[in-house]
From Swiss-Prot:
Residues 5-93 form the ABM domain. Coiled coil: none annotated. Putative monooygenase that might be involved in antibiotic biosynthesis, or may act as reactive oxygen species scavenger that could help in evading host defenses. This is Putative monooxygenase Rv0793. The lineage of its organism: Bacteria, Bacillati, Actinomycetota, Actinomycetes, Mycobacteriales. It comes from Mycobacterium tuberculosis (strain ATCC 25618 / H37Rv). Keywords: Monooxygenase, Oxidoreductase.
C-alpha cells in the first residue's frame, strides 16, 4: 500500500508582485484539483498577510511526482522565482496518524 503525502509550500512575495503571485497560484488550483492523485489543494494567507501558503494532499508520492511533471506545474515553476523575495519553502510530510491516511 502506498502512503499519502502532504505538502506545505510557503511563498513570500515581492511587494510589487503580490497580485501576480496570487494570480499564478490561483491558476494552479483547478487543474491540480482535477489530477487523479490530488486529495486537496488549498491556498491560504498567513494571519499577518505576509505569506501565501499552499496546503496540498496527494494519494501517494507517485501522485506528487506526477503533479510536479504536469504542464501547469512546469509553467508555474518557470514564473514563480521572479515574484518572490526568497525561494519557496517546501515541506513534504508523511502521516503518522493512519486515520488521516
Amino acid at each position: 500500500m502506498t502512503s499519502p503525502v502532504a505538502v506545505i509550500a510557503r511563498f513570500m512575495p515581492r511587494p510589487d508582485a503580490r497580485s501576480a503571485l496570487r494570480a499564478l497560484l490561483d491558476a494552479m488550483i483547478t487543474p491540480t484539483r482535477a489530477e487523479d492523485g490530488c486529495r486537496s489543494y488549498d491556498l491560504y494567507e498567513s494571519a499577518d498577510g505576509g505569506e501565501l501558503v499552499l496546503f496540498e494532499r496527494y494519494r501517494s508520492r507517485i501522485a506528487l511526482d506526477e503533479h510536479r511533471g504536469s504542464p501547469h506545474y512546469l509553467n508555474y515553476r518557470a514564473q514563480v522565482g521572479e515574484l518572490l523575495t526568497r525561494p519557496v519553502a517546501v515541506t513534504v510530510l508523511a502521516p503518522l496518524d493512519e486515520a488521516s491516511a
